Amino acid sequence: MPIIKIRDNEPFDVALRRFKRSCEKAGILSEIRRREFYEKPTTERKRAKASAIKRLSKKLARENLKRIRMY
């Protein structure tokens, strides 16, 4: 859990913004959303495999686009 120390003469809004930013960097909200409902291990593996395939296809598309621009 991210911890921030409130500085002297620091407005509450600024401290809250710093806390939200540190939570975002730590990935707490995405972790909570991911664990909100139980997901079967097979479904979890299937989702991970699908995201890996999607990442790979994006990478290949970017590399292919670079090759086309060279000529």
From Swiss-Prot:
Keyword Ribonucleoprotein attributed: yes
Pfam families cross-referenced by the UniProt entry: Ribosomal_S21
Disulphide bridges, residue numbers: none
Keyword terms of this UniProt record: Ribonucleoprotein, Ribosomal protein
Highest taxon in the source lineage: Bacteria
Signal peptide: none
Family: Belongs to the bacterial ribosomal protein bS21 family.
Cited HAMAP family: Ribosomal_bS21
Name of the protein: Small ribosomal subunit protein bS21
Species assigned in the record: Buchnera aphidicola subsp. Cinara cedri (strain Cc)
Gene that encodes the chain: rpsU
